[in-house]
Amino acid sequence: MMSALSQAAKSLLLQDFVSAFFLSMRQFFAPKETINYPHEKGPVSPRFRGEHALRRYPNGEERCIACKLCEAICPAQAITIEAGPRRNDGTRRTVRYDIDMVKCIYCGFCQEACPVDAIVEGPNFEFATETREELYYDKDKLLANGDRWERELARNISLDAPYR
């Protein structure tokens, strides 16, 4: 009898409706969690894996030593490297360094395998194109990406260094 009486009082006073209404009002006036994307950008983690880039040393020489570890470890087989002849000092550089971004799965294995931090995945995630051919990155495009993002790439690598 008591439970029926309390149930009737609860429905008569619209307790569920009122509590739901106050919950809605609290959420309505709370700060918004979304951002207006094209005009505002959220924070990007230093470990974010975006558009690929080839880095240079401070003297302007490219870092890649044509060891081909990134090509060997790539599970999608998206990287193609051609090594040039050995130089007088015994080192090699690449003649051709291509990445097919359509095949790439952005796993980051190439970046982890590189002994000289030459190939990195940068902070850029806005690289949509109209044709598939534009997603075939050659060495010049990768070096241009590295030059454009070098300051942020160096900062991200230094922030990630304690965890490597």
UniProtKB/Swiss-Prot annotation:
InterPro entries: 4Fe4S_Fe-S-bd, 4Fe4S_Fe_S_CS, NADH_quinone_OxRdtase_chainI. Its cofactor is [4Fe-4S] cluster. It catalyses: a quinone + NADH + 5 H(+)(in) = a quinol + NAD(+) + 4 H(+)(out). GO terms for biological process: aerobic respiration. Keywords: 4Fe-4S, Cell inner membrane, Cell membrane, Iron, Iron-sulfur, Membrane, Metal-binding, NAD, Quinone, Repeat, Translocase, Ubiquinone. [4Fe-4S] cluster 1 binds at residues 64, 67, 70, 114. Pfam families: Fer4_7. It is found in: Cell inner membrane. Its main location: membrane. Its EC number is 7.1.1.-. It is a peripheral membrane protein. NDH-1 is composed of 14 different subunits. Subunits NuoA, H, J, K, L, M, N constitute the membrane sector of the complex. NDH-1 shuttles electrons from NADH, via FMN and iron-sulfur (Fe-S) centers, to quinones in the respiratory chain. The immediate electron acceptor for the enzyme in this species is believed to be ubiquinone. Couples the redox reaction to proton translocation (for every two electrons transferred, four hydrogen ions are translocated across the cytoplasmic membrane), and thus conserves the redox energy in a proton gradient. This is NADH-quinone oxidoreductase subunit I.
